[in-house]
């Protein structure tokens, strides 16, 4: 057991070249923990608030020096001498110090960086891995990756409305094999796109961002790449979508400019049901807008028995919004983004709330990432069985896959790859 003696913060860059917060926490024993926080492009209106400086003379107003200052003054003063392993008390102290419902005063970026760095320092103090410290002795499930190999929406400069087209190597025997399968398909997709005259530039999350105009185009290319790489769509590899529908929801309608469609909620549900009937799509994230609760109920009634319906902007990793969804029977899965809620303990509460209600949980990165691989450990710690951490390019994405490979290697025969156990059955 060791007390916090010092907290140091700094402004670093994320994968988009924007400033973010990194924090070092030092304990009396000399143990240290470091954490850097991500940021999102398509952010939910109900997320905890990132504090930005607003000084247009630095980083176009996106600087985080105010958040850094809050860490090194108010937060340090509140936590200095606190027991590092009392994570809930530490997180609650920062929440109380902030005094707002969405962490807007101190900044969720400041609070989260400290929260995660404290956990890492505590793990270092005990000389155990972070996944073991957070998850205990039964933390051993390696997650199925949702690999974002075609980017659209807010993550790419192309006409595709849907934000992410992902593959899941459910048929692989191990996590390391799943990463290999994904890499092989990604390489094949690059060849196919290039041969068809499309660019192979990558988007924020490392997937390709070709000038395709429809979901059918993207899914068609992915299907052919899976087959050409020697795998069977729907058996070895399943598909997942992140529609990020809030981004094209206007005045009660879903305006899909790339598709040339304007749909009401029922029309959007029918559109998604048609895609799921024609392709091996087993998971759809944010298929409807964050406050279209009635539409979500229809989507859940239509597809919820056979398709994982993931709430991201809908739930924003917030236990209260999740409980509302559970009570209403809306969605059946929670996307877990630590910076949406802003502390480790609240993140774990959200995962526990989901799992107790029979909802699945998917650990997730953000589009603006760093080399910090904490979410890989958290995916194993929570045994959630699924992770979204981008494509098979960009070191900010592959850092998480590499950490999962290390964890699987360390767990040895105790490791269990989730594989097909994540699939819903009618």
UniProtKB/Swiss-Prot annotation:
One cellular component (GO) term of this entry: phosphopyruvate hydratase complex
Pathway this chain belongs to: Carbohydrate degradation; glycolysis; pyruvate from D-glyceraldehyde 3-phosphate: step 4/5
NCBIfam families for this protein: eno
GO biological process, one term: glycolytic process
Cross-referenced SUPFAM superfamilies: Enolase C-terminal domain-like, Enolase N-terminal domain-like
KW DNA-binding (keyword) present: no
Cofactor note (record): Binds a second Mg(2+) ion via substrate during catalysis.
Protein name, as recorded: Enolase
Species assigned in the record: Gluconacetobacter diazotrophicus (strain ATCC 49037 / DSM 5601 / CCUG 37298 / CIP 103539 / LMG 7603 / PAl5)
Compartments it resides in: Cytoplasm; Secreted; Cell surface
Function description: Catalyzes the reversible conversion of 2-phosphoglycerate (2-PG) into phosphoenolpyruvate (PEP). It is essential for the degradation of carbohydrates via glycolysis.
Cofactor: Mg(2+)
UniProt GO MF annotations: magnesium ion binding; phosphopyruvate hydratase activity
Gene name per UniProt: eno
Predominant place of localization: cytoplasm
Keyword Secreted: yes
